Amino acid sequence: MNPVWYSGILGYGVIFISACAGLFHWRTRAQRSRPPVEFKLLRGPGELTLRTIRTLDASLPLTLLFCVLGPLVGGLGLFAAVWPLAGVTQIVGGVLAGLGFLAGVFFSGRFVLRRLGLRQELELRFLGERAVAEELAPLLAQGFRMFHDVTILGIGERLDLDHVLVGPAGVVVVETETRERNGKEAGPRQHEVTYDGKQLVWPWGPDRNTIAQVEAQAVCLSKWLAQSSGIKLPVRPVLALPGWWIDLTGRGSVWVVNQKQILSTVDVQAETPLSAEQIDQISRLFEQHCRDVTN
C-alpha cells in the first residue's frame, strides 16, 4: 500500500477520535438537567463512592474508543514509516512495527481491565456502605443524627468517615470495609474474620492497618470536636464488615461487627449522655462538611 494511503488513514483516525471525543463531551454537558431550585442536600451513604463510579462510567466510552483505535492508528503510523524502506531494513522495521502494535494492544487491554476492576471494587464498597446505613436507620427514631461520607480537612490530616452518628449515647464513627470472598483459596472458613483486639485475620492473611486506621480516625475526630465545639468526649470507633462472620477472640478499642450486629453495638448508653443542645451543636458542625449534594 502506498505511504500516502497510510498517512490518509492515520489522519482520518486522529480526526475521527477527536470528533468523537468532542461530540461526547458536548452531549454530556447538554444533557445535564437543571432543577427548579438550587438544592444543597446532605450526602447519602456511599455518596463519594457513587460520584467516582459515575465519573468512571462517563469516561468509559472514550476510554474504550482510545484503547481500540489508539493501537490501530499507532500501528498504521509505524507501518507507514517502514514502507519506504527496502530490503532487510524494511523487514526488520516491519517486525518492530508489528511488535509495537501488539504492545499497544496489550497495554490498552490491561488499562481497560484495570478500570473495569476498579469499578467493580467501588460498586462493592458502595453496596456495603448502603447495607450498613440501612441497618443504622432505626436509630433516627431514637434521637440520633446520622451523617455519611463526612470529609474534614485542616486538622493535620484528612478525615474521610463513612458514617458518623450523634445521639444521646455520644458520637460514634462507623467505618465500612467491604471485601469479597475468595472461596478457592480460603478453605472451609472462607466466610469468617477473626478479631483479637489488635488485628483482623482474614482467610488470606492478617491485617493490622485497618484497625489502626479506624482507631486513629476516632482519636483525631475527638480532638477536632474539642477544638471546634469545646465539647470534650471520646468518639467510639466501630468497624463494620458486611457479609462476614466475626470470630471475636479478644477486645480492643475498636468494635468489629457485621451489618446485623451493628445496631446493638452503637445503641449503648454512654456514662454521660449528650444533651439535646449538645447533639444539635455537634450536628451543625458535621452538616458543614457533608451538605454539598446539588444534583
Predicted regions and their residues:
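Phosphate-centric recognition/catalysis
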Residues: D162
